[in-house]
Amino acid sequence: MALITDTISSIDAVIESSWSGKYFLTVDIDWAIDEVISDTLDLIATSGKAATWFVTHPTSIIDSIRKTPRQEIAIHPNFNGLLDGSAEESTADTVLARLLNFVPEARAVRSHSMTQSSRLLQKFKTVGLSHDCNTLIPLSAKMRVRPWKDWNHLTRVPHVWEDDIWLHGGEPVVPLRPIDDCLTVVDFHPIHVALNSPSIDHYESTRTVHRHWPTLRSRRHVGPGVRTWFEEVLQG
């Protein structure tokens, strides 16, 4: 049976059929260059699978994502600078406003580093977001993962697998099918897909070429890695 995929905003916490038996593919673009993002988009477009894209910056590739069937745009705000004092923007409100200015259709949010708090959750709701994706419950926890409605009626959507967490070791490879009686949301990053990252050390060793596509592509790992699992998911 073909893999049934859908977008994050389609999840209704009180309607189990909106997520049970489905597979939710998410992508955090993390300031990657256009060629890296396009590489991942081309793979998804060819497969016909649905995906939700958490965007970090304005780029013409966003319009390409919009034009690709079954793709959803979401936001990936970075609040880290507010925590360490290095932010150009002074408040969480300005961080959100900047992103929503170029992707006003966004309904889902996952913060960079999964930064969250009760105040941020309320801000997400206030600006019109409906789905928060800032919780990782890894496969190793062996829990029955489900979405839920928060106190402010924001739908909380945890994910069970993330490529950069897998790269640090200790977690199984990405599930290729929906997990029985479990919300199955997975998270990939285009830079790891492009590099076919097999380990965090390989990724770190290539940092100096992340802005130069020809060289980056030449450093793609030959053998099992993130791209391997990504392509296997898309072939499902």
Listing of model-derived features with the role each one plays in the protein:
Residues 20-29, 75-90:
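Glycine-rich phosphate-binding "P-loop"
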Residues 91-98:
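Glycine/small-residue-rich loop that forms an oxyanion/phosphate-binding "nest" at active or ligand-binding sites
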Residues 1-70, 101-105, 118-130, 134-236:
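Terminal accessory/targeting
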Residues 113-117:
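Gly/Ser/Thr-rich loops at beta-strand to alpha-helix junctions
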